[in-house]
């Protein structure tokens, strides 16, 4: 099957019907219409990229209308909205170190693709076996289970669903990788998320930062300034 993935931002969300029509013309089987996740360069440009709540509602309604006209034919459309507007965090990577292991070009083994922004040391497959990394490495074990969780996660009856949310997102927004993901309405830092979403659609405070090969800014440096 052919799978297409489209990255949705505030700049192109109004074209979502055209995107679906193009997907049908290309005979795609599955199409993910996913709002960009705010890590790396998307985080750096978040004020430009984050759609408003109304834009997301309008886009989802357009997707549902298109689905209704398909009569069971054509691509399967999957609409993914950003968790910034949710009251509970996503179960990032299905829980830290439970399902995924990412190997980067330099051989670093990571529990998730963004984990290198965290103040942790990660192993390398050039030096250790995958079996040893998965079962014994400190970084992979660090956020497994719930013993690391702060309040309110520790006593929450939903902790086995969302695992405290995204460690990278908690770190980016609060500077503390142990904190409850600010997406959660129970988080003492939830006001940070509301402050971000309330600004969506307003004039950004700075220009878009484009990543160029000849003038590349490492993501770690960008994150360190936050």
Segments and roles (model prediction):
Residues 52-86, 108, 114-164, 187, ...:
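C-terminal accessory region of radical SAM enzymes
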Residues 97, 149-152, 180:
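A generic structural signal for well-ordered coil/turn residues at beta-strand boundaries
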Residues 160, 203-226:
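Short flanking/linker segments adjacent to small metal-binding domains or redox-active Cys/His motifs
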């Amino acid at each position: 099957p052919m799978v297409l993935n489209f990255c949705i931002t505030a700049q192109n969300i109004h074209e979502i019907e055209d995107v679906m029509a193009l997907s049908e013309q290309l005979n795609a089987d599955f199409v993910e219409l996913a709002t960009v996740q705010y890590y790396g360069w998307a985080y750096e440009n978040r004020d430009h990229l984050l759609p408003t709540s109304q834009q997301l509602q309008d886009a989802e309604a357009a997707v549902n209308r298109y689905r209704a006209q398909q009569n069971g034919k054509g691509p399967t459309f999957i609409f993914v909205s950003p968790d910034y507007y949710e009251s509970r965090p996503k179960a990032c990577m299905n829980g830290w170190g439970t399902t995924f292991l990412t190997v980067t070009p330099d051989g670093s083994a990571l529990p998730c693709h963004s984990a290198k922004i965290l103040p942790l040391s990660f192993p390398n497959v050039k030096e250790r076996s995958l079996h040893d990394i998965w079962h014994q490495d400190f970084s992979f074990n660090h956020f497994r289970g719930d013993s690391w969780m702060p309040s309110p996660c520790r006593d929450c009856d939903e902790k086995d669903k969302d695992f405290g949310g995204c460690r990278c997102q908690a770190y980016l927004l609060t500077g503390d990788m142990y904190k409850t993901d600010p997406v959660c309405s129970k988080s003492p830092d939830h006001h940070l998320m509301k402050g971000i979403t309330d600004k969506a659609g307003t004039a950004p405070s700075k220009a878009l930062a484009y990543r160029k090969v000849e003038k590349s800014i490492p993501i770690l440096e960008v994150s360190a300034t936050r």
